[in-house]
Regions:
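Residue-level detector of alpha-helix boundaries and kinks
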Residues: 12, 68-69, 88
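Glycine-rich loops and low-complexity Gly/Arg-rich segments
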Residues: 28-31, 54, 60-63, 102, ...
């Protein structure tokens, strides 16, 4: 699990979409959701001709780069316990809505280790 998207957020396999290549990942909805699909031609047209869409996309990409950077740094510098506690503080709703095995995978730990961490934290 490399990414968890909550309500009113978006996700994609951007490399696959923009470069017209098969994706190296799959995207799975864990709950019913509204799916919006756009083809590359329409996407590029909107990006070039619609200022609001261009700003939306730019802000989205900027936020995603920051999230990815933080996630990578956390994986390298924080212990599994610290990553779990950070998740508790920053995204507590994930613990209610996402099955634990996905959260464990996202945190870079096994489900068993996740259970031990949860038990030790209380």
């Amino acid at each position: 699990t490399t990414y968890l998207a909550l309500r009113n957020s978006s996700t994609s396999s951007l490399n696959s979409f923009l470069n017209k290549i098969p994706s190296r990942k799959s995207i799975k909805a864990l709950v019913d959701c509204k799916l919006w699909v756009i083809d590359l031609e329409t996407f590029n047209h909107l990006l070039k001709n619609n200022k609001a869409f261009h700003e939306f996309y730019y802000n989205l990409i900027e936020k995603q780069i920051i999230l990815i950077d933080d996630y990578r740094i956390d994986l390298l510098t924080l212990t599994p316990e610290e990553r779990y506690q950070k998740l508790l503080l920053t995204e507590p709703i994930l613990l209610q809505e996402v099955p634990l095995h996905y959260l464990a995978s996202f945190l870079g730990i096994s489900s068993r280790h996740m259970s031990r961490i949860r038990k030790s934290i209380g």
